């Protein structure tokens, strides 16, 4: 019997292992950015009857991913990452300002800016790196969540494709968690929704990698309206 390790048992190079460890940490539900308190308008969609079960939640999130905030945030993350990598302070500021402005409601702006601020704060205290302070300063006062993730990942040399797909997975999982608490859904149905959205997450990430800032835009009027209507919703659990 051979004592040689199989190819599948070969360890990852140290740099890849560190990048994977950091990415999984930053995008874990345990990373304290407060994502659990936001629903991106899903709470109003449930109240209005647009989302009432696993199938309608899947369809709603598929649209948000491919034609709404999911795609826009993915594109912004990519451009923030590349500007950080190039030390393009002017370009990074332009992306950060666009990301802060490109939201459909006051609550959605609160959602992305508060998470971005928390992400940067924790990253600088626990995961600081050479160049991170400069990149953060270049972003100005308002740093949206996807910009924050792009800046930190680029500063640590975590590959962009992995960062992007990890970010989309984390955002989608949080949306599903919100939907599960509101509808409500069981754990198995929630995982079925996530599994069904895998192709959409991959397709959105792949498209965002080659998209320009001119490609930004949404076609999810109902979801955008939901984020506006949530601001005056009488009874609610979430901040957006």
UniProtKB/Swiss-Prot annotation:
Domain of life the protein comes from: Bacteria
Keywords (A to Z) from UniProt: Chaperone, Cytoplasm, Nickel insertion
Subcellular location, record wording: Cytoplasm
InterPro entries in the record: UreF, UreF_sf
Gene Ontology CC: cytoplasm
A GO molecular-function annotation: nickel cation binding
UniProt entry tagged with the keyword DNA damage: no
Role according to the record: Required for maturation of urease via the functional incorporation of the urease nickel metallocenter.
Family: Belongs to the UreF family.
Assembly and binders: UreD, UreF and UreG form a complex that acts as a GTP-hydrolysis-dependent molecular chaperone, activating the urease apoprotein by helping to assemble the nickel containing metallocenter of UreC. The UreE protein probably delivers the nickel.
Protein name: Urease accessory protein UreF
Species this protein is from: Rhodopseudomonas palustris (strain TIE-1)
UniProt lineage: Bacteria, Pseudomonadati, Pseudomonadota, Alphaproteobacteria, Hyphomicrobiales
Gene: ureF
